[in-house]
């Protein structure tokens, strides 16, 4: 007897946060395109044994929240259970402390108000800290496109003790 295999990866398993309206819509469109492409690869690789549910008409496209990731509660925007296996991937904005706009400085203040010298942090440090809070004690990992400055100079003493204090494992 021949068994048919269905793909187990669904768009409903994808979550994200995007600030810009156009980028938010592009993220949703990109998920639909990626699903279509991966379903085709899945079916082609398994020949007559693989199936994927049709994606037309377009329905759910993941859970992409339009909002400011620095101010949202990630566990509400991207719910997680203890049994979940989660990967956070991103390309957050790098903006040095002297090039930040007032709104970005306010974002830093909201996240790091308990730190004396939070104003000297790079903007991207918010994503590192919030992701460490999010993955703490869970089966989760995060990876970001970043600059090496997050691990050099004054950033090290300002940011990393607080991330290490969350007892997360860091891989390089």
Set out the residue ranges of the language-model regions.
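SAM-dependent methyltransferase catalytic region
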Residues: 1-172
């Amino acid at each position: 007897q021949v068994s048919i295999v269905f793909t187990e990866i669904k768009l409903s398993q994808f979550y994200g946060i995007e600030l810009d309206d156009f980028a938010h819509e592009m993220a949703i469109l990109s998920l639909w395109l990626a699903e279509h492409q991966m379903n085709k690869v899945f079916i082609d690789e398994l020949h007559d044994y693989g199936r994927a549910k049709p994606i037309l008409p377009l329905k759910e496209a993941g859970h992409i929240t339009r909002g400011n990731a620095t101010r949202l509660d990630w566990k509400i925007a991207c719910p997680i259970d203890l049994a979940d296996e989660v990967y956070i991937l991103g390309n957050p904005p790098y903006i040095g402390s002297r090039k930040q706009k007032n709104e970005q400085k306010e974002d830093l203040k909201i996240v790091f108000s308990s730190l004396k010298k939070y104003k000297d942090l790079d903007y991207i440090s918010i994503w590192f800290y919030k992701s460490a809070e999010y993955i703490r004690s869970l089966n989760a990992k995060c990876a970001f496109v970043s600059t090496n400055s997050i691990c050099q100079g004054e950033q090290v003493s300002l940011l990393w003790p607080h991330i290490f204090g969350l007892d997360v494992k860091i891989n390089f």
